[in-house]
Amino acid sequence: MANLRELRDRIRSVNSTKKITKAQELIATSRITKAQGRVAAAAPYAEEIQKVLERLASASSLDHPMLREREGGKRAAVLVVSSDRGMAGGYNHNVFKKAAELEKLLAEQGYEVVRYVTGSKGVGYYKFREDYVAGAWTGFSQDPDWNATHDVRRHLIDGFTATSDGTAKWRDGLNVAEGQEIQGFDQVHVVYTEFVSMLTQKPVVHQLLPVEPVIEDDIFERGESALSDGKNEIEPDYEFEPDADTLLEALLPQYISRRLFSIFLEAAAAESASRRNAMKSATDNATELVKDLSRVANAARQAQITQEITEIVGGAGALSGSGESD
């Protein structure tokens, strides 16, 4: 059994750590509320621009490069969204695992994978493994800003527009010399953590480009719902100036850019929730450990007192016996 001083030192150390984890838990909780508020604030714009795109899609030819799957694609960009800070449980590990699965699948399909990373933890992870990263952006994982995420958003859109046979212009954050042109790609995938609830966050893969045909599905589902409800709503007839194809050309990049920014916002909420859960678990474990150590310390203290009493009684008995013999 450890001596009493060692046990008390351990209790003080655990209590000190507990204060840190509790503070981190409270900070993460407040950040979750803020992050959820930002996600909710961005939702109306995203919904409206999607409605406009639905109208444009129904009136245009839908023959747009950002909507069309390219035959014989050669290169696929994968953006891995990680955190800038640790103490978030399995948040980053799960994303890295999901990204590895995606990269393996793309390689089996014949694509050359071009990896991009956001977040210091992702940069450090791939650097330690000596895996090449074509571009990295850090400093905004907990509080994404529209301007701070500009370069990564524009590069992914420009790189896809250029195709694997063309080149895109250099942007800050890319792992090449300034001014050098960058080879484009034919697909863009984003691996990030989806915020499901305060207790659940899961890594997901989202194909950013080409845009998956969810617009037509959404229109069909809403139409089926209206029929099942017995409603016969007449959709308004819009006129587009100059024409639907031109407007689609202008709005699609904005839609994709906004979609990627929404992913950063959701990942920020998931990061804070994951950190809050990890810190709460650490705080609870520290509380239990202090209870166990205190129980052991009390037993050690009781044993020490018992031993001291025994020694005193024994000593007194010895002195008493010595006096009688005299």
From Swiss-Prot:
Single annotated GO MF: ATP binding
Domain of life: Bacteria
Any GO CC annotation of this UniProt entry: proton-transporting ATP synthase complex
Pfam family, one: ATP-synt
Membrane topology classification: Peripheral membrane protein
Alphabetical list of PROSITE patterns matching this protein: ATPASE_GAMMA (PS00153)
Residue ranges of the TM segments: none
Protein task: Produces ATP from ADP in the presence of a proton gradient across the membrane. The gamma chain is believed to be important in regulating ATPase activity and the flow of protons through the CF(0) complex.
NCBIfam families: ATPsyn_F1gamma, PRK05621.1-2
Protein's recorded name: ATP synthase gamma chain
Native organism: Corynebacterium efficiens (strain DSM 44549 / YS-314 / AJ 12310 / JCM 11189 / NBRC 100395)
Gene name, Swiss-Prot/TrEMBL: atpG
